[in-house]
Regions:
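Exposed, low-structure sequence patches enriched in small/polar residues
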Residues: 1-185
Length: 185
């Protein structure tokens, strides 16, 4: 049974469609813009009995622009985004078993908070006859905050990013690493 492992669960989904027409008054429309948005397509958030919290959100948006002037054309832009996160709080006051000292527990005077966020987004756009755009972005971020005592606390974070232009074949990647410590006297 899911109720034995999950303390709360939420699900959301929403769709919206709009059509905008423009042109000279009393004449046929020269431009029609149709937007279809799933904001969000899926949004699921769960709190687990273990203290872990997870969430996943996905959104999709499509814009179609039709020009009826002259030969006319139709351009389409589709964008999507996905995000997944996990958060876990570990009660370190009860002790944490370490791999290299399994018989002993390492105790802190507070909890350790761990987090992981993965995000992905993409854009695909086509404007006849030759213009087009196809890009995507990926980021992964992990964080940890801790407090060894009332006088010593800190945080650690690691991040990875990737940006790709699939139309011209260019990829950029980046890494970030951060470590902070706070001493109180």
């Amino acid at each position: 049974r899911i109720s034995k492992t999950v303390s709360s669960l939420r699900f959301d989904s929403n769709f919206r469609r709009t059509v905008e027409e423009s042109g000279a008054k009393g004449k046929a429309s020269e431009r029609v813009v149709t937007k279809s948005d799933w904001q969000p397509l899926v949004n699921v958030a769960a709190s687990w009995k273990s203290g872990m919290r997870t969430s996943y959100t996905s959104s999709v948006s499509t814009t179609e622009t039709e020009s009826r002037v002259g030969a006319g054309y139709t351009s389409t832009t589709t964008s999507s985004s996905h995000s997944f996160s996990v958060q876990q709080t570990i009660d370190a006051t009860k002790g944490i078993s370490l791999p290299f000292a399994s018989s002993r527990k390492f105790k802190l005077k507070s909890s350790v908070n761990l987090g992981l966020v993965v995000q992905y987004s993409s854009v695909n756009s086509t404007i006849p006859p030759q213009l087009s755009e196809k890009k995507d972005d990926l980021s992964v971020t992990s964080t940890a905050t801790y407090s060894f005592s009332t006088n010593l606390s800190g945080s650690f974070n690691f991040g990875f990013t990737q940006n790709r232009d699939l139309q011209i074949g260019v990829t950029r990647r980046g890494l970030t690493l951060g470590l902070t410590a706070s001493f109180r006297f």
